[in-house]
Amino acid sequence: MWDKLEKGPIIMIGLADGRSHSEPLTAQLDRDQVDTIWFFIGKDNRLAKGGAAMAQFVSKGQDFFACLSGRVAVDNNPAMIDKLWSKPVEAWFPGGKTDPNLALLRFSIDEAELWEADMSLTGKLKLLFGGKIRADEEGSHAVVSDTLV
């Protein structure tokens, strides 16, 4: 999943409170933390209040899909801000790493449901021209609820 996120890092994420809509944010990845995705947001962003959250991701090639659940919280760890900081992030925060509106949001993933459309050639032809796709011609699916390594 991390390779797919690096190629197209936009994730739809929102609070799982039944009142908020998801919004597109750019994922900041730290491969040392396989159960965490980071986002730079404004302190005035609705996600800054934290809580249970859901995120959805579709890869750039539209062959990989993920639905993630967990919790979001602001975590303005200066070392992590330094590690994840980039020119594209700086474009959103003119005050740099000390911008008064800057917040680093941690999304701690509790569970992930993943689908990969690694369909066989025969399955792709059936999609194109019609026909029933058998189980061995479908992609793969997994539910991951323990991300500890």
Please place each PLM-identified region on the residue numbering.
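N-terminal leader/targeting segments and the immediate start of mature chains
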Residues: M1-I10, V143-V149
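A short, Trp-centered hydrophobic/proline-enriched beta-strand micro-motif
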Residues: D3-S20, A53-F57
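A positional/architectural concept
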Residues: S20-T26, W38
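Short, structured beta-strand-loop surface elements
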Residues: L47-E111
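C-terminal edge-of-domain segments
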Residues: T98-V149
